[in-house]
Amino acid sequence: MAEPKYKRVLIKLSGEALAGEKGVGIDLPTVQAIAKEIAEVADSGIQIALVIGGGNLWRGEPAAEAGMDRVQADYTGMLGTTMNALVMADSLKQLGVDTRVQTAIDMKSVAEPYIRGRALRHFEKGRIVIFAAGIGSPYFSTDTTAALRAAEIESDAILMAKNGVDGVYNDDPRKNADAVKFDKLTHVEVIKRGLKIMDATASTLSMDNDIDLVVFNMNEPGNIKRVIFGEQIGTTVSNKAELRK
């Protein structure tokens, strides 16, 4: 087997990725299909962390705009990410993959608290760790959670698994047939161009900690493994890449 490009990765999934064609809620067959892809990679000896959004269940910003207290709205969203994490963990465990959920808010009846040293020991023992409940504070996105946790666990890369989007473009390819896809970008270019891969806080964290981002289409079976083993798919963002287009 070829040598992997990345040996420890953090996979960032949107909450909507778990909803399937419904777009909202949790579609269990969809979760199970994603879990199967992740399990195949774990079987290759890759150390894997996951961060899953909560947008399939709740969005804090629209709730705040509708009149809800923003802090309470964001805490509600953190609970949504925990629900998604528990469902994904169960699907992975049913495939024989030892998995732990760690939450930034204490929920000891259902998950471990986030402790960096414990997470690192889980990786050493071949376990997948799912980080839930954001960073435990309002106003921070799950993109920022992914960037922060990736830095803390010294992940080689963040894999931004997208629904039906095969990389980063200079315009929306669904609206502009002439939109150009980038193969490689620098973190600085992403920030300067205002490309919405992650929010600005998450992008800056990734740049400052020299963490690669790979944006790719998760709906294509085998793509997670292809990215990890160095196949050029999607868009890679790093401090070293040169702008190609």
Swiss-Prot record:
Pathway: Pyrimidine metabolism; CTP biosynthesis via de novo pathway; UDP from UMP (UMPK route): step 1/1. The lineage of its organism: Bacteria, Bacillati, Bacillota, Bacilli, Lactobacillales. UMP binds at G54, D74, I135, G136, S137, P138, Y139, F140, S141, T142. InterPro entries: AceGlu_kinase-like_sf, Asp/Glu/Uridylate_kinase, Uridylate_kinase, Uridylate_kinase_bac. Residues 20-25 are annotated as: Involved in allosteric activation by GTP. One of its GO terms (molecular function) is ATP binding. Its main location: cytoplasm. Keywords: Allosteric enzyme, ATP-binding, Cytoplasm, Kinase, Nucleotide-binding, Pyrimidine biosynthesis, Transferase. GO terms for biological process: 'de novo' CTP biosynthetic process; UDP biosynthetic process. NCBIfam families: pyrH_bact (TIGR02075). ATP binds at K12, L13, S14, G15, G55, R59, N163, Y169, D172. Catalyzes the reversible phosphorylation of UMP to UDP. It catalyses: UMP + ATP = UDP + ADP. This is Uridylate kinase. GO terms for cellular component: cytoplasm. The gene is pyrH. It comes from Streptococcus thermophilus (strain ATCC BAA-491 / LMD-9).
